[in-house]
Amino acid sequence: MATQPATESVQCFGRKKTAVAVTHCKRGSGLIKLNGCPIELFQPEILRFKIFEPILLLGKHRFAGVNMRIRVNGGGHTSQVYAIRQSIAKALVAYYQKYVDEQSKKEIKDILVRYDRTLLVADPRRCEPKKFGGRGARSRYQKSYR
């Protein structure tokens, strides 16, 4: 049995509320696929631009040498989009750290953090559960004294 050389790949995830996106990033020709479809076909268009933010910020030349396969599930449309963009950014940073060099990784990280910190750091806010004695998490039923 011949051993094949290990492919240069990293796997990163992004989270927003209950949405989780996992990105497999490996050496390639610049293809980015989302659930098996090209990322350019993602609908609606407004949310597609949100996904393209890390790509437009860093420039296509940084993505030219890598292929990305993204799987996303859970949450709503907007949460999924935020999870996707976070996983793309984190995967590229991890790939550059592991297989390129520390200097360009730091450059990428600085650009992303200066633009939007949530591209690399998850938002810890979650929905607060409902309690008894009211309609929601904090609101209470009206109280009558007479």
Swiss-Prot record:
<dbReference type="GO" id="GO:0006412">
    <property type="term" value="P:translation"/>
</dbReference>
<dbReference type="GO" id="GO:0009505">
    <property type="term" value="C:plant-type cell wall"/>
</dbReference>
<protein>
    <recommendedName>
        <fullName>Small ribosomal subunit protein uS9z</fullName>
    </recommendedName>
</protein>
<keyword id="KW-0687">Ribonucleoprotein</keyword>
<dbReference type="InterPro" id="IPR020568">
    <property type="entry name" value="Ribosomal_Su5_D2-typ_SF"/>
</dbReference>
<dbReference type="InterPro" id="IPR014721">
    <property type="entry name" value="Ribsml_uS5_D2-typ_fold_subgr"/>
</dbReference>
<dbReference type="InterPro" id="IPR020574">
    <property type="entry name" value="Ribosomal_uS9_CS"/>
</dbReference>
<dbReference type="GO" id="GO:0022627">
    <property type="term" value="C:cytosolic small ribosomal subunit"/>
</dbReference>
<dbReference type="GO" id="GO:0022626">
    <property type="term" value="C:cytosolic ribosome"/>
</dbReference>
<dbReference type="GO" id="GO:0003729">
    <property type="term" value="F:mRNA binding"/>
</dbReference>
<dbReference type="InterPro" id="IPR000754">
    <property type="entry name" value="Ribosomal_uS9"/>
</dbReference>
<keyword id="KW-0689">Ribosomal protein</keyword>
<dbReference type="Pfam" id="PF00380">
    <property type="entry name" value="Ribosomal_S9"/>
</dbReference>
<dbReference type="GO" id="GO:0009507">
    <property type="term" value="C:chloroplast"/>
</dbReference>
<dbReference type="GO" id="GO:0009506">
    <property type="term" value="C:plasmodesma"/>
</dbReference>
<comment type="similarity">
    <text>Belongs to the universal ribosomal protein uS9 family.</text>
</comment>
<dbReference type="GO" id="GO:0005739">
    <property type="term" value="C:mitochondrion"/>
</dbReference>
<dbReference type="GO" id="GO:0003735">
    <property type="term" value="F:structural constituent of ribosome"/>
</dbReference>
